[in-house]
Amino acid sequence: MAHADTRTLLQNQSEGNVEAQVDIYRRLTERLQRSGIERIAVTSVAGHFCIDAFREVSPVPVIDLLDVVKLEVRRRGFKRIGLLGTRVVMETRFYGVLDDVEVIAPVNDLLEVHEAYVSMASAGIATPGHREVFMRAGSALTSTHGCESIMLAGTDLALVFQKGVDPGFDTLDCAEAHAAAIANAAMTR
């Protein structure tokens, strides 16, 4: 396991600096490859803004969160799904990979959701204010916009949306789906 700095990642994502982030991923992957890894996963949803470019240069196969989530959305049969995450993830409707489903981002509070997410991810804790922003946005997406489920398209949203605690609407935790795919890949070498 290797860690790409969150602040640098979010800055590269915000600025669309694909080349810089891919270089970080490549160097980390090469270091891990010397330790014997056979596959790599970028576990940050935000970090997938450059995943196609990274796959082209990665010395090992990439377990792609976007592919995993696309399959899970299809498996669950969603036609309209809401989205919470960073500004880029929401504005691009999950990087444009969900072509079989209508993806709805928060309409009036997209920037507020983004700012709450970045604040929470940077601090590593969720405050009551963060929770209120995400719960309000998720509720609006389901009740006002008719979304069948809310995609938790930010790795750190697990700080707010915890197992066994019903937020009042269905969720699809992208990080959880990705973690299951990573575990499956590890067990089926």
In which residue ranges do the predicted regions lie?
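Non-catalytic structural scaffold of enzyme domains
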Residues: M1-R189
